Amino acid sequence: MAAESDVLHFQFEQQGDVVLQKMNLLRQQNLFCDVSIYINDTEFQGHKVILAACSTFMRDQFLLTQSKHVRITILQSAEVGRKLLLSCYTGALEVKRKELLKYLTAASYLQMVHIVEKCTEALSKYLEIDLSMKNNNQHVDLCQSSDRDVKNEDENSDKDCEIIEISEDSPVNIDFHVKEEESNVLQSTVESLTTEREEMRSPELSSVDMSFKDNEIRILHVESISTGGVENGKFSQPCTSSKASMYFSETQHSLINSTVESRVAEVPGNQDQGLFCENTEGSHGPVNEIQNLEDAFSLRHQCPRCPRGFLHVENYLRHLKMHKLFLCLQCGKTFTQKKNLNRHIRGHMGIRPFQCTVCLKTFTAKSTLQDHLNIHSGDRPYKCHCCDMDFKHKSALKKHLTSLHGRSSGEKLPRHDLERQNLL
């Protein structure tokens, strides 16, 4: 006990911050810097130990080569890359809201996990805040719009009220026609559904636009309404359509808020086939505008696993999480494994971090480098389980199995077929 009491323990809580500040000061004075990072045409001098501790990508670069110069091509902005590397010394990063995706992409490429997590949290936070603000603004606009409809009832007695419905994730246009004498029913229905939307709002609903513009239309999507209140209002009933079920399968019993540019309302409705049938005779509203809207707002993001399509990348990214897919923000290609996405991004950036020590040829993936080394060593590690042939490259084995045996690399021959192959 006496020996333990003689031991004094000191804890320096600010040691990490102080060391980083001094290291950054030495970097600014270009003292003890052992590596130069070139991001496009921008040079950043630093210390390998600091950069390797903050970036897995930089650590792998330093392990693969002993060169004092590392070149990185970041397509978005060299300034973004420089600030990311500088944050390794300062422990802080200032990101403009409109450049959040740029920083997220660059940090993912540099494998700076702590920055990726912060950017992802910030992106989700701002999307939720913007969605809440938009919903509040839309509720006010809906009330004002309903009041104007009631006031103008006498002036427009020969006209029908039109409600354009557009789902958040698809450019489908639906027109409902309500006679002027039933406008009170419409107003009460909209108000009740607005309250219901607050209680049943789905967390998946969002919009990429940060704020409404003056020339945009505030639009409601009415998916299901009680039949008692609708029959008197002469609402149009939907026809059976596979296309309708595709777009509305996940939005039943909910109100979906969205925005559409004012020019959408001007699209002529002269298509030959519509999605909804009219129960009210004599109405001549634009009910066949679906094809025109699809031409104006084509689905820019099509899910590779299901028929759903999306206009906004934020909605598309959220949907891909359901399928456990990883999206390349540069070209839109999806991957089932994150390591394949990282390798794909290196191809966009022009980075080939794996180099052959024999011929100095560079590659984007370690597996490709290993196949290349088999050429120098003469090894043939890939063996066909159907015959005695072996190959240097895995791609050559796959081609052999497909062309000669009609099988993929993961399939094995039945035992009797294998014995027959050996006899031949």
Swiss-Prot record:
It is found in: Nucleus. Residues 403-424 are annotated as: Disordered. Keywords: DNA-binding, Metal-binding, Nucleus, Phosphoprotein, Repeat, Transcription, Transcription regulation, Zinc, Zinc-finger. InterPro entries: BTB/POZ_dom, SKP1/BTB/POZ_sf, Znf_C2H2_sf, Znf_C2H2_type, ZnFinger_BTB_dom_contain. GO terms for cellular component: nucleoplasm. Signal peptide: none annotated. Residues 33-97 form the BTB domain. GO terms for molecular function: DNA-binding transcription repressor activity, RNA polymerase II-specific; RNA polymerase II cis-regulatory region sequence-specific DNA binding; zinc ion binding. The modification Phosphoserine is found at S202. GO terms for biological process: negative regulation of transcription by RNA polymerase II; regulation of cytokine production; regulation of immune system process. It holds the Pfam family BTB. Gene3D superfamilies: Classic Zinc Finger, Potassium Channel Kv1.1, Chain A. Transmembrane segments: none annotated. This is Zinc finger and BTB domain-containing protein 6. The lineage of its organism: Eukaryota, Metazoa, Chordata, Craniata, Vertebrata. The gene is ZBTB6.
